[in-house]
Amino acid sequence: MNYWIQHRLNCLEQAFNPKYCRALEHTIGIVARQFKAGNKLLICGNGGSAADAQHIAAEFVGRFQLHRKGLPAIALGTNPATLTAWSNDYEFETVFARQVEAFAQPGDILWGISTSGKSANVIRAMEMAKDLGLLTIGMAGNNGGMLKDLTDYPLFVSEYHTPYIQEIHLITYHRICEQVEAQLFAKAGLEAQIAV
C-alpha cells in the first residue's frame, strides 16, 4: 500500500514539472481572459474524460470556492438526444465537431480531453475549432498524441497509464478553476468567502 501511494506521488511530481506548470499558468490566463471578454468554454471527451468535462463545466457554471456569478461552460457529452441522433444518422466521429459548429462563436475556447491523445471525435472537434478560428486547449497523456498540432494551449504529460493521467487531469483542472475564479472575482472586491 505504501509503495502504491509513493508511486502515485512520484508520478504527480514528475508530471507537474516546471514546463508543465508554465503551460498551466498560460492556460489559466487565456481562460480568464476569454471569460472576461464574454466568451464561453466548450469541453469534450469520452468516458472518464467526458465525466471530467462535466466536472469542469459544473465548477465554472456553479462555483469552485467563491460565491460569484456563473461562467459560461458547456460539456458537449451531456445531451443524449443529440449524441445518439447524430451518431445514429451520421457518425460518432463527428458528434462533438457538429456541436462545436452549432455553439461556437469567435473568441470561444474548445477544451479537448483525451487520455490517449488519439480519440477520433475529440480530434475532429479540435479540427472544427481550428477551422472556425477558436482557441484550443488540449489535455492528454502520451505527450499529446494526435492533439499536438491542433492545440494552442497544451497540457500534455508523458504518462501512458490512463488512471494516472486522469489523476493528473483532475489536479490540473481544479487548479485552473481555482485560479480563474480568483483572477476574475477575488480581485474585483466581490465576496471571497469559501463555499462549504
Curated annotation (Swiss-Prot):
Keywords, alphabetical: Carbohydrate metabolism, Cytoplasm, Isomerase, Metal-binding, Zinc
Top EC class, one word: isomerase
Source domain of life: Bacteria
Cofactor names: Zn(2+)
Signal sequence range: none
EC number: 5.3.1.28
Positions of substrate binding: 46-48, 59, 88-89, 114-116, 119, 166
GO biological process entries: carbohydrate metabolic process; D-glycero-D-manno-heptose 7-phosphate biosynthetic process
This protein's pathway: Carbohydrate biosynthesis; D-glycero-D-manno-heptose 7-phosphate biosynthesis; D-glycero-alpha-D-manno-heptose 7-phosphate and D-glycero-beta-D-manno-heptose 7-phosphate from sedoheptulose 7-phosphate: step 1/1
Record keyword Electron transport present: no
SUPFAM superfamilies for the chain: SIS domain
GO molecular function: carbohydrate derivative binding; D-sedoheptulose 7-phosphate isomerase activity; zinc ion binding
Binding site for Zn(2+): 55, 59, 166, 174
Catalytic activity reported: 2 D-sedoheptulose 7-phosphate = D-glycero-alpha-D-manno-heptose 7-phosphate + D-glycero-beta-D-manno-heptose 7-phosphate
Annotated cofactor note: Binds 1 zinc ion per subunit.
Keyword Transmembrane helix: no
An example Gene Ontology CC term for this record: cytoplasm
Compartments where located: Cytoplasm
Protein family (similarity comment): Belongs to the SIS family. GmhA subfamily.
Note: The reaction produces a racemic mixture of D-glycero-alpha-D-manno-heptose 7-phosphate and D-glycero-beta-D-manno-heptose 7-phosphate.
Described function: Catalyzes the isomerization of sedoheptulose 7-phosphate in D-glycero-D-manno-heptose 7-phosphate.
PANTHER family: DNAA INITIATOR-ASSOCIATING PROTEIN DIAA, SEDOHEPTULOSE 7-PHOSPHATE ISOMERASE / DNAA INITIATOR-ASSOCIATING FACTOR FOR REPLICATION INITIATION
Protein name in the entry: Phosphoheptose isomerase
